[in-house]
Design a protein with these regions (language model features):
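Charged, compositionally biased N-terminal leader segments and the immediate start
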Residues: 1-41
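A short, histidine- and acid-enriched strand-loop-helix "catalytic/donor-clamping" loop
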Residues: 49
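Alpha/beta enzyme core
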Residues: 30-41, 52-84, 93-244, 250-281, ...
Length: 308
């Protein structure tokens, strides 16, 4: 229904002011901080998307995905028996089989997510995008992170964008689909809102801010606009769509701020791995350092924490 987006206007100054207020929020402390950080861990898509990825470093990542926080630290927080893991492991299609096998080896049912559809640029013929998605699913990916064609957004080809995402959704089959908008390359916040709505209308299970490869990745103004779109879509259809900020989320405070923003904009029901993810490669390390400090009262040295 293109009528939903034809008259969209985003008050950029108001959005930016709201984002500035978010940055000034006082962070939680003590046990509350530890609880929020453990919640963040369960929402992380632990990611490696490098040209030099190998079966060995993917295997280490998968082990860390199952054991994100040191066992003795979890025992000190009385959380050792809660089965805390990250939400998913995210890799390139060529590394999906490595990740699936590594997780099986440690008896872990964490889903493997694969980027696809011409990631990160989206400058790939649709036939190739669909074939890549199907291969990733065939290899064992249970979640697919596609990336949209920014060209279709910037030239206002909304029906073509809808059709491309719809075909990607069809190619995913039973796998969940997250649609990456690459918001830093969409030109304006109105386009972010419109692309969000089109992606949801086409069947996306999640909408995601960024590939992590753009100059500008997950920002609070973009997050506010995308979450308002999710809320509007829910009011119109009754369907809940997930939200995933990704790129540049490196610190424990970043994670807590995103969690608090989701709670304010969408409500506590979105604070689950089924509806909220954090795309990150280095975030988990900082979270574990903060939990180490909370439990021991001292800063973690390099040898204190396992490498991912």
């Amino acid at each position: 229904e293109l009528g939903w987006i034809s008259k969209v206007h985003v008050n950029r100054p108001a959005v930016v002011r709201h984002a500035e207020q978010i940055k000034k929020w006082r962070t939680v402390k003590g046990n509350w901080q530890a609880a929020w950080l453990l919640k963040a861990v369960t929402c992380i898509d632990l990611t490696t998307l490098s040209g030099d990825d190998t079966p060995s470093n993917v295997g280490r990542l998968c082990f860390k995905a199952k054991h994100p926080i040191r066992e003795d630290l979890l025992k000190a927080l009385d959380m050792h028996d809660k089965g805390i893991t990250v939400a998913a492991v995210c890799v390139y299609p060529a590394r999906v089989t490595d990740a699936v096998n590594a997780l099986k080896a440690v008896a872990c049912n964490i889903p493997v997510a694969s980027v696809a559809a011409g990631f990160p640029s989206g400058q790939t013929p649709l036939e190739i995008k669909l074939a890549e998605i199907k291969l990733a699913v065939q290899y064992g990916a249970r979640e697919i992170d596609i990336v949209i064609s920014r060209t279709l957004v910037l030239t206002g080809q909304w029906e073509d964008l809808y059709e491309e995402i719809r075909q990607c959704r069809e190619a995913c089959g039973e796998a969940h689909m997250k649609t990456i908008l690459a918001t830093g390359e969409l030109g304006c916040l109105a386009n972010v809102y419109k692309a969000s709505m089109i992606a949801m209308m086409a069947g996306s299970d999640f909408i995601k801010t960024s590939t992590g490869k753009e100059v500008e990745n997950a920002t609070f103004p973009v997050g506010v606009v995308m979450m308002r779109a999710i809320k509007d879509f829910y009011w119109q259809t009754g369907n809940k769509v997930g939200f995933k900020p990704a790129g540049g989320i490196r610190t424990a405070n970043d994670a807590i701020t995103w969690l608090m923003l989701v709670k304010e904009e969408l409500g506590v029901e979105w604070l689950t791995p089924e509806l909220f993810r954090l795309g990150a490669s280095s975030l988990l390390e900082d979270i574990e350092k903060q939990i180490f400090y909370h439990v021991t009262g001292s800063c973690a040295l390099q040898h204190d924490l396992a490498m991912a």
